[in-house]
């Protein structure tokens, strides 16, 4: 608090309130090095909020967190986003889906898409397809299509989810688009690198 220039009189009260808000009251006397990754992230958020900033900027805030801590941290960020602007730079699309009311997608330093999550996802309606195929056909189609997901089925088949302007496999059906699909549509090079 002293490094933030807070007056000593109100600092203790503000620290207590923030520790409670980020669920760290029980570990307040522990050294930061002894805390889990998620707890360290919450300490960072509490430190950033000491001066009650209007804008909070976070880079990859949930990277490396286990699923439970990730959900807890996303919920915390959503709560803080109600009172201030929270800018998040991340490649973890699910974080954005659950936190952001408004999204901007940047490529090479330029905004290439901006809207609500629902508005962005609408941009790729009728570009996400799904088709169940026999396992032995997988290799044939996996490299010809922009496959975004494979799901093994109990009957030994595979459900392909892929991106295309029109269905590429007979009997393909439209699939409900997600924000991750939009990301892969806008950044096809990400899929090429994975092949």
Annotate each predicted stretch with a short phrase.
Residues 23, 44, 125, 187-188:
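A generic structural signal for secondary-structure junctions
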Residues 73-161:
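ABC transporter nucleotide-binding domain
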Residues 1-107:
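ABC transporter nucleotide-binding domains
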Residues 146-195:
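C-terminal coupling/interaction segments
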Residues 26, 135, 164-166:
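Non-catalytic surface loops within mature trypsin-like serine protease
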Residues 19, 74, 121, 180-184:
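Conserved protein kinase catalytic domain
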């Amino acid at each position: 608090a002293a490094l933030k220039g807070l007056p000593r009189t109100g600092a203790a009260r503000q620290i207590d309130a923030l520790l409670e808000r980020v669920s760290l009251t029980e570990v307040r006397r522990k050294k930061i090095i002894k805390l889990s990754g998620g707890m360290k992230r919450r300490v960072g958020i509490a430190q950033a909020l000491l001066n009650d900033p209007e804008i909070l900027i976070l880079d990859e805030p949930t990277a490396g967190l286990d699923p439970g801590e990730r959900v807890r941290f996303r919920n915390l960020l959503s709560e803080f986003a109600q009172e201030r602007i929270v800018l998040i730079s991340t490649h973890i699309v699910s974080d954005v889906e659950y936190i952001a009311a408004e999204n901007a997608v940047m490529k090479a330093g330029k905004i290439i898409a901006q809207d609500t999550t629902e508005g962005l996802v609408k941009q790729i309606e009728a570009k996400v397809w799904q088709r169940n195929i026999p396992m032995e056909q997988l290799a044939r189609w996996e490299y010809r299509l922009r496959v975004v997901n494979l799901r093994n089925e109990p009957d030994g088949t595979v459900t392909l989810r892929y991106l295309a302007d029109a269905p590429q496999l007979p009997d393909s059906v439209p699939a409900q688009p997600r924000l991750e699909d939009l990301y892969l549509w806008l950044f096809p090079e990400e899929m090429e690198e994975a092949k």
